[in-house]
């Protein structure tokens, strides 16, 4: 064995000393002084900012919501059972961010952007903070492009445009989710990205929705953000912001996005739970004072951007669940005042077989005709008027049997219009067929058809036009206007002659 020379050792030690770099990582560290119910109070983080992410000793993340004199109130984003008093908490200096990008399409993620569908990790195009300012006045453009839902009652009377916020409100089990799923399925081939945010739903329900969209071929352009009923309140609170953040990535690239929040009542309840645990003063219905801002800052991020910014859009369909049809409660009135209209679904109509159960009297779109094609505007005008007159007369007709001919004719027409507004679930209809269907009803072609036969008449008439007079439907599709009325009437008359009423 060769002997080690002392000069070699000394030169080696000198080299090591010269190359030594002392790296000191300075972090703000605080101590947990109280923990429970998903909330922790942390002492010693005076420099923490509102909305900042903190890291607990066991790796679980938390978000600062309360800044108090001697401690900060933190909501915990994960299991809080292992966190105990005396644990250390580090500041990260970062706010909450989620991954964005095309790779998220077709995937199911939680509000932190982590995949929960068992299909492996997701490559992303970077991260965006979940709280970002809404586009300003000059960055916006008025809503003028229709977003076809494929549902006759909505596209004709309560039209939705790209960049609009349209509230869907109703009791539980009135078909709110069905309306949203039909709308998502109808966006196939229309260059739209869809984001479905499930807030406080059962896991089985979310699994059914994923399967429904997959079967319809709609999952490939849809992202599902799911905060289920078993998730902690902060996850339910974050889910809608995660959804709109992912949507903004596409909007600012000039894309068009449909964002469905199902439903915001559960988000408000989760926020109320967090606020009460953080000892914030309660207001009406025990909601905190800033519950209006909770929803307004979310829904204001839906916009139609100006041409200078790429003319992209986010259309928001927020859901609110009412109790026994009470739309004058706190959260419903808040969201009605924030949105550009509401679609009111009614239990009585649903139980009477009128599905989708849209109450056309209480529903409204504040964008209106500017979100409709010319042909639909022409046929929808008489439809709204006739249905309003029918509703008025139907109330009186219950009391008296002696009705004059004009009143009887109105009631007859109204019954058939109500029947033609019915539609099967997951069966969205292209706009040209909607126009043909409503045209036949408002022009009196159905007046002598029994109500029970109206749906069959409609189905067979549309397939007749498809196979024998495709140029009429093609004209509506391409020019967005009605074809020559004489030709249209003659085609419907020709079909009607061959239509046999079953006795």
From Swiss-Prot:
The record marks 363 as: Required for activity. Its EC number is 7.1.2.2. Keywords: ATP synthesis, ATP-binding, Cell membrane, CF(1), Hydrogen ion transport, Ion transport, Membrane, Nucleotide-binding, Translocase, Transport. The keyword Ribonucleoprotein does not apply. The gene is atpA. It catalyses: ATP + H2O + 4 H(+)(in) = ADP + phosphate + 5 H(+)(out). The lineage of its organism: Bacteria, Bacillati, Bacillota, Bacilli, Bacillales. It is found in: Cell membrane. This is ATP synthase subunit alpha. GO terms for cellular component: plasma membrane; proton-transporting ATP synthase complex. It comes from the Bacteria. It is a peripheral membrane protein. CDD domains: ATP-synt_F1_alpha_C, ATP-synt_F1_alpha_N, F1-ATPase_alpha_CD. Its main location: membrane. Produces ATP from ADP in the presence of a proton gradient across the membrane. The alpha chain is a regulatory subunit. InterPro entries: ATP_synth_asu-like_sf, ATP_synth_asu_C, ATP_synth_asu_C_sf, ATP_synth_F1_a_nt-bd_dom, ATP_synth_F1_asu, ATPase_a/bsu_AS, ATPase_F1/V1/A1_a/bsu_N, ATPase_F1/V1/A1_a/bsu_N_sf. F-type ATPases have 2 components, CF(1) - the catalytic core - and CF(0) - the membrane proton channel. CF(1) has five subunits: alpha(3), beta(3), gamma(1), delta(1), epsilon(1). CF(0) has three main subunits: a(1), b(2) and c(9-12). The alpha and beta chains form an alternating ring which encloses part of the gamma chain. CF(1) is attached to CF(0) by a central stalk formed by the gamma and epsilon chains, while a peripheral stalk is formed by the delta and b chains. PANTHER family: ATP SYNTHASE SUBUNIT ALPHA, MITOCHONDRIAL. The keyword Cell membrane applies. Belongs to the ATPase alpha/beta chains family. PROSITE patterns: ATPASE_ALPHA_BETA. One of its GO terms (molecular function) is ADP binding. ATP binds at residues 170-177.
């Amino acid at each position: 064995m060769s002997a080690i020379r002392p000069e070699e050792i000394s030169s080696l030690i000198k080299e090591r000393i010269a190359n030594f770099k002392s790296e000191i990582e300075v972090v703000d560290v605080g101590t947990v002084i109280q923990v429970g119910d998903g909330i922790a109070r942390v002492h010693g983080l005076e420099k923490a900012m509102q909305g900042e992410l903190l890291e607990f000793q066991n790796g679980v993340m938390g978000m600062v919501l309360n800044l108090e004199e001697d401690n900060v109130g933190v909501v915990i984003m994960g299991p809080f059972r292992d966190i105990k008093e005396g644990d250390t908490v580090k500041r990260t200096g970062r706010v909450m961010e989620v991954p964005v990008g095309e790779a998220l399409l077709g995937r199911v993620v939680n509000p932190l952007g982590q995949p929960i569908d068992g299909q492996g990790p997701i490559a992303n195009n970077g991260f965006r903070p979940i709280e970002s300012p809404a586009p300003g006045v000059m960055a916006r453009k008025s809503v003028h492009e229709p977003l076809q839902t494929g549902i006759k009652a909505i596209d004709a009377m309560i039209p939705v445009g790209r960049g609009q916020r349209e509230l869907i409100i109703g009791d539980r089990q009135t078909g709110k989710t069905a309306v949203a799923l039909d709308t998502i399925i109808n966006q196939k081939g229309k260059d739209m990205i869809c984001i479905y945010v499930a807030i406080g739903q059962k896991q089985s329900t979310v699994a059914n929705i994923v399967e429904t969209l997959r079967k319809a071929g709609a999952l490939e352009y849809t992202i599902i953000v799911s905060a289920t009923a078993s998730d902690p309140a902060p996850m339910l609170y974050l889910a809608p912001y995660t959804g709109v953040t992912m949507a903004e990535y596409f909007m600012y690239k000039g894309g068009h996005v449909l964002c469905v929040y199902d439903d915001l009542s559960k988000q408000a309840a989760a926020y109320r739970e967090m606020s009460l645990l953080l000892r914030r003063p309660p207001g009406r219905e025990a909601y905190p004072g800033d519950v209006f801002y909770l929803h307004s800052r979310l829904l204001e991020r839906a916009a139609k951007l100006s041409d200078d910014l790429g003319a992209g859009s986010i259309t928001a369909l927020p859901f609110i669940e009412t109790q026994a049809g009470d739309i004058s409660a706190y959260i419903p009135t808040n969201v009605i005042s924030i949105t550009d209209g509401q679609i009111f679904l009614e239990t009585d109509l649903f139980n009477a077989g009128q599905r989708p159960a849209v109450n056309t009297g209480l529903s409204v779109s504040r964008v209106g005709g500017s979100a409709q094609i010319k042909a639909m505007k022409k046929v929808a005008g008489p439809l709204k008027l006739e249905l309003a007159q029918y509703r008025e007369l139907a109330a009186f007709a219950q009391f008296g049997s002696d009705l004059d001919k004009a009143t009887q004719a109105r009631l007859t027409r109204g019954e058939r219009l109500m029947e033609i507004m019915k539609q099967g679930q997951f069966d969205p209809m292209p706009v040209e067929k909607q126009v043909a269907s409503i045209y036949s009803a408002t022009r009196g072609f159905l007046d002598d058809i029994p109500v029970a036969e109206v749906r069959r008449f409609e189905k067979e008439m549309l397939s007749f036009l498809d196979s024998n007079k495709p140029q009429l439907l093609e004209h509506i599709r391409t020019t967005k206007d009605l074809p020559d009325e004489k030709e249209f009437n003659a085609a419907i008359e020709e079909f009607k002659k061959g239509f046999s009423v079953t006795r």
